[in-house]
Amino acid sequence: MILSDRDIKARIAKGDIGIESEDGNHLPNIGASSMDLRLGRFFKMYKHSSIAVIDPLKEYESLTQTLEITTGEPFIIQPGEFVLAVTMEKVKIANDIVARVEGRSSLGRLGIIVHSTAGFVDAGFEGTIT
């Protein structure tokens, strides 16, 4: 079942859905059956490297750099770049609710993909969404 805006608001009021933002704005924009979340300040980018093959069983921390962006500062993503980001909001969902992360169509029309494969948020999750 997909929750409507009324259901989302009721579950927030009941404490089954919690939203806490680092900037103190606790009420996200709630759509007909969705909530808008914002990108946080931290981004992890892959450095350009000469490694032709990446083994998923190995750690490649040296290939990434973490950036902190201040409010209002632009963050430029070049075509073909891959960036990991976290939400500004910490999310808490009850054990009987799951969530999905989807991009906005306005970003999709610009060729920006919000998630590669990890769009599912498990029941009982608490934290920022990557």
PLM region descriptions:
Residues 1-130:
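DUTPase catalytic domain/fold
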